[in-house]
Design a protein with these regions (language model features):
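Transmembrane helix segments
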Residues: 61-68, 177-219
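Alpha-helical transmembrane segments of multipass membrane proteins
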Residues: 37, 59-60, 64, 140-145, ...
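Hydrophobic alpha-helical transmembrane segments of multi-pass membrane transport proteins
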Residues: 57-61, 74-146, 197
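Alpha-helical transmembrane segments and their short interhelical loops
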Residues: 117-188, 236-246, 250-254
């Protein structure tokens, strides 16, 4: 009976076959998570309805059909629709998605795969920014087809404003989605979405507003984002609206960092 020759241990350096587990590169980890989040986001019909179909229908319908007596409807409707699209993707979409991910234990399972909590949140933020970028390109093309006059400088400045709005609404969406129950989130997120759309549309088409009602309406994040985008498209900066957005964003991010949970309390 013959035996196989033994390998010469001197052929391999000591430790060659020793396990060396380590975390993946941070940038690669975040981008992989963002790609996963983006694919999941666009596979949901409700997300498509909130982020693309409804805002697009509002843009085309309110410009083509004289529902409101506006001298230049596109100048008022276009910034408003952009703000609503950001709110839909960052707030309503994320709140509902995160809430049901928590409800069914998806976030816990992702965490068990080695992705840290900050990686999950960062991936969601990058995913929303990607969605908002695609929205902006699509709605800009439709706006141009409807007769909008967009300068390169104003278009880029408005994009910066939309990214600021993305930070604000995503932080608020993560706050709601990471603290409440899934069923409550579903109803409350949609209710707030409808209220903010109504307030933003009212401000955009109203002939003039003054007094305390005007002040209160312009403190809403959706109205403030509309003001920022409208000013940016005209190559200007609406500093008071920027300040309102920063306050909302910092407040939402701070509260989300403090109270966000990756599972339901009874899990």
């Amino acid at each position: 009976m013959t035996t196989a020759p033994r390998a010469d241990a001197s052929r391999f350096a000591k430790g060659t076959f020793a396990p060396a587990p380590q975390r993946s590169d941070m940038a690669k980890l975040v981008m992989s998570q963002a790609w996963l989040e983006t694919k999941l986001f666009w596979r949901h019909g409700e997300q498509m309805l909130l982020t693309i179909i409804i805002p697009l229908a509002m843009l085309i319908g309110l410009v083509m059909v004289p529902v409101f007596e506006l001298d230049h409807p596109l100048e008022r409707i276009f910034p408003m629709v952009l703000a609503i699209s950001v709110m839909s993707a960052g707030f309503t979409g994320q709140a509902i998605a995160v809430g049901f991910d928590r409800r069914y234990g998806a976030l816990k399972r992702i965490g068990a795969s080695g992705v840290p909590p900050w990686g999950i949140i960062a991936g969601k933020i990058v995913s929303v920014c990607t969605t908002v970028t695609l929205q902006y390109i699509l709605f800009s093309l439709v706006g141009l087809a409807l007769g909008a006059e967009l300068s390169i400088g104003g278009w880029l400045l408005a994009y910066v404003g939309m990214l600021l709005g993305t930070f604000v609404f995503t932080s608020l969406g993560l706050l709601m989605g990471g603290t409440l129950g899934a069923e409550l989130i579903l109803g409350l997120a949609n209710l707030i979405w409808f209220i903010l759309i109504g307030a933003t549309t009212y401000v955009a088409v109203a002939p003039s507003l003054d007094g305390i009602s005007s002040v209160l309406l312009h403190l809403l994040p959706s109205v403030a984002l509309t003001d920022v985008i409208s000013a940016a498209l005209a190559m200007s900066v609406h500093w008071s609206a920027v300040g309102v957005l920063i306050v909302w964003g910092v407040l939402g991010a701070a509260l989300a960092a403090r109270w966000f949970r990756f599972d339901m309390p009874n899990d």
